[in-house]
Each structure stands twice: as structure tokens, then as C-alpha cells.
Amino acid sequence: MCMVSVIVPVYQVEAYLPRCLDSILAQTYDDFELILVNDGTKDNSAAVMEAYAQRDPRIRLIHKENGGLSSARNAGLDIARGRYIAFVDSDDYIEPTLLADTVHAAESTGADQVLFNYCLEDEAGVHEPYLHFDDEVIDLDDMGLDRYFYRYWMPYKHGQEAWSKLYRRGIIEQYGLRYAPNAEIFAEDTLFSAMYLLHTHRIAALSKAYVHYVQRGDSLMAMKKPRLARRLMTLSVRLCEYAKAVGREKEIRSVLPVLCYDKLICKGIRFDPSLDDVYAAMRDMAGNATMQQLLRQLMGVMPLVQYTLHTGKGIRTQVRARLFAWRWLHGDVRGAAALVDGREDRA
């Protein structure tokens, strides 16, 4: 058994992969295994993987048919042997002390999760650290999950990406956590991170930027996002169902409806390339019992009062959210969508 399993999904990254792998193999901490998952790549990435594996015994290879990013990460999790799990995207690269610093933080504080910063890198060069937070250890049992979501997740002070954290594999395996299929939900990182949070007692936050998040014009995040509204609504439903299944729903009742509305559902409606798809998704989801419950909770007083207190948004935002939920529940999907779409010129 090693201390860390580093999982790298690989697909169409021939030009970026050597820099990524070099940065991992150059870590000042060497008690790790590197799991490279070939997700059916069609370029020369598989040959690059094989060449590196011949040079370093810490590298383990998986070759599989293309199944998407979630499928590749799950394949890596299935064979991981480390006490901790770290994900690195194959077009990014990392600082030499990432593993040393995060393992030390986890071991010295007893944190279930170590969260760290990153910087964007594009044609203009490397930018400043993207997120703004302090080094700290957060005891979620003292703070409360609802306050953590409002204080750190809602304003995006702490990232939700898979590759900005060190996880305990024991928690992942104990609760059977895996990434949902990309075809079914958007922002699979968000769902996994939220589910993991429900089993987290302590977080160690490191403000240093350890990951160089490389911006590519042909990356998954840069492409158009078909069925975005439906996939984010599905994410919302699954998060609510999971919180209920593990007995944490009551603890986050004041934040969960607002989180799903403000950060997921509204985002899906605003940025889905097809309003027809938005309306169809809303009609289909209107019959979902979990979505109905979420919308009724959104109309309640407490979630929206907490929303205003923590975000500084005024009474108009509360009224809009309640009206959105009321219209959707009563079948007026066009009227509900119009409240949050914000673009008059959409066809």
C-alpha cells in the first residue's frame, strides 16, 4: 500500500501529457502510485503513457473504451491502493510540493479533505491564484454544514473541482462514492464533492496555487453544453436524494434548495443553448417528487432568509426565487424560465 494514488484520465492530450506526467514524477514526495487511464484516446497519448510506464515502476496503466471523464476517474478509483486520492487532469500540471504539502496537512490535522488553490494558464501566461481564501482548518461539526455551504461554496471561495483536493480513499470506499456519468449530469465534480462533504468532519485549506489549470480552446469546458439545464436539474435531484439517503438532509435544509436553485438550476437555464430543451426539461422534471419537494422548500421562509443574510442579495431576489418555484410547480415553465434567463434576444 502506498500513501497516495494519483489518478490521471487521458484522452486526446498528446501535446500536453508529457508536461503533466513530468510534473507528477518530479514531486518531492515519492510514496505514491500514478494511475493513467487511457479513455479510448485516438491520438498518440497511449504511446506516451506506455513509454513513461516503462521508465517508472510507480505507474499503472488502464486501457479502456471511451466512456467520458467520470468513467475514467471511476476506473482509476476501482484499482487505487493509496490511503489518499488525488486527481490531475492530463492537460494540467502541478507544483513539485503538492503531494508533500497536502499529505502533511492531512496527517498533521486529521483532515478528511485537503483543499488547495490553483492558477489559470492560457496564451497570455500564468495568472494569479484564482481563489481567495486563507490557510485554515475547518471543523465542520462545529461550523455546521449549512454555514460551510453558504460561507465557502455559494460564493465559490472553495473550489469544487476534483483536482483541487486530496481525499481519503477510506471515505470514498466506505460510502461507495463514484462520479456520475457525464451524459446524465453536468459538473460531475460538484456532485462528487458535495457527496464527499456530507461525510467530512474536518477540512484543511491551503491557499497556495498548486495546480496550473491550462485553458484550451478545444477543452470540454470550452465546448457548447447541450442539455445543460436537464443535466443540472438531474444533479440537483441526485444531490437532494443522496443527502436524504445518508441522513444529512435536515442539517442542510436551509441551504440545499437555495444551492440547487442559485448555482445549478438557474445556471442551466441561462446557459443552455436551446430554450426548447430548457422547457422540455422543466416539464419532465415537474413530475419528479424530489424536484417538487425542492421547489416547495424554496418557497419557504427560512431558506430565502438565510440566502439573503449570507449573500447580501435583497428582497427582490427572494421574491423572484419564490415566484420561480410557484410558476414551475403550477406548470408555467416559460414564465418561470423567463425570471432567471435574463436574455431578451434568445430565440
Task: Locate the predicted segments by residue.
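Catalytic core of nucleotide-sugar-dependent glycosyltransferases
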Residues: 208-217, 222-250, 262-291
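Glycine-rich, basic loop-to-helix element that forms the pyrophosphate-binding segment
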Residues: 64-80
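Membrane-interface aromatic/basic loop that binds lipid-linked glycans or pyrophosphate carriers
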Residues: 111, 241, 269-347
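Donor-binding/catalytic cores of nucleotide-activated saccharide
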Residues: 69, 90-204, 211-227
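Short, well-formed alpha-helical segments that are part of the catalytic scaffolds
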Residues: 12-26
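Short aromatic/hydrophobic "clamp" motif used to bind/position activated sugar donors
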Residues: 85
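Cell-envelope/extracellular polymer assembly enzymes that use nucleotide-activated donors
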Residues: 2-5, 23, 33, 191
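A conserved acidic beta->alpha catalytic loop
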Residues: 30, 38-47, 65, 89
